[in-house]
């Protein structure tokens, strides 16, 4: 499954600052059972906005992780809650329909 959210930086906080903290938290979160990686994308035309896509074995695995178990992750998420506007886009199943280029 995919968990997708957008983060828009408030004035005075940069995407690069966000990304540094996001990487620190993500490295810890990725130690959780069922974690399959996470990606951070810059939004074209909006230099203060990124989209994160976290990959999990299942919704159950994602729901079972506990961000409060680690003080570093908890502190980073609290900081992001103050410095960014976070919009959850949603939780998505793995793709049912895939078209890839044929070479």
Give names to the regions the model predicted:
Residues 2-9, 38-70:
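Short, well-ordered beta-strand segments in beta-rich or mixed alpha/beta enzyme
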Residues 6, 92-94:
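Short amphipathic
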Residues 8-20:
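Short, surface-exposed ligand-recognition loops at beta-strand->loop->(often short) alpha-helix junctions
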Residues 14-15, 49, 88-92:
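Intrinsically disordered, low-complexity regions enriched in Ser/Pro/Gly/Gln/His and often acidic
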Residues 24-36, 55-91:
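An amphipathic, aromatic/His-enriched active-site/gating alpha helix that lines ligand/cofactor pockets
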Residues 94-103:
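Short, low-order "capping/linker" segments at domain edges
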